[in-house]
């Protein structure tokens, strides 16, 4: 599962999820991808479940890129504990996803296989997504 090797601070503020994604809004590495339509926290377990669903459907064919990383810690207090006495212990890691962000990319498989694999992956995620293709510019790909 994905998690940072080391962090400067063990606990972070929750923050706001306003606006659209600044970067990572286009398919760069693969041919097909899924793009977030809503803002949400996506946990490292959800990312891993989506990755497994895709690779199992593709039967180890093709290549998968994970474009998000869970770098934000979230905390939780134990059950039946009174309020106060500080912030809770770190519980897990999340990736902050805003609308427009490409989450996963796939290449090396047909469009039908990619569409189904990404559909299965999207069912593991807590947000609405859409299937996107690499944009062609003047008849050739935007790879340089």
Curated annotation (Swiss-Prot):
UniProt cross-references to InterPro entries, sorted A to Z: Ribosomal_uL16, Ribosomal_uL16_bact-type, Ribosomal_uL16_CS, Ribosomal_uL16_dom, Ribosomal_uL16_sf
A single GO BP: translation
The keyword Nucleotide-binding is assigned to this record: no
Gene name of the record: rplP
Protein name (Swiss-Prot/TrEMBL): Large ribosomal subunit protein uL16
Any matching Pfam family: Ribosomal_L16
MF terms in GO: rRNA binding; structural constituent of ribosome; tRNA binding
UniProt key word rRNA processing: no
HAMAP family from the UniProt entry: Ribosomal_uL16
Domain of life of the organism encoding this protein: Bacteria
General function of this protein: Binds 23S rRNA and is also seen to make contacts with the A and possibly P site tRNAs.
Taxonomic source organism: Bacillus subtilis (strain 168)
Subunit structure, interactors included: Part of the 50S ribosomal subunit.
Keyword vocabulary terms for this entry: Ribonucleoprotein, Ribosomal protein, RNA-binding, rRNA-binding, tRNA-binding
């Amino acid at each position: 599962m994905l998690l940072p090797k080391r962090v400067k601070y063990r606990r972070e503020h929750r923050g706001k999820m306003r606006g659209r994604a600044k970067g990572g809004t286009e398919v760069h590495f693969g041919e097909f991808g899924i793009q977030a339509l809503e803002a949400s926290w996506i946990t490292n377990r959800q990312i891993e479940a989506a990755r497994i669903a895709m690779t199992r459907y593709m039967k180890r064919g093709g290549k998968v890129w994970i474009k998000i990383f869970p770098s934000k810690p979230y905390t939780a207090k134990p059950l039946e504990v009174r309020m106060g006495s500080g912030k809770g212990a770190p519980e897990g890691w999340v990736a902050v996803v805003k609308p427009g962000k490409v989450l996963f990319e796939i290449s090396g498989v047909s469009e039908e296989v990619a569409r189904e694999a990404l559909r299965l992956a999207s069912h593991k995620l807590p947000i609405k997504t859409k299937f996107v293709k690499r944009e062609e510019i003047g008849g050739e790909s935007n790879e340089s």
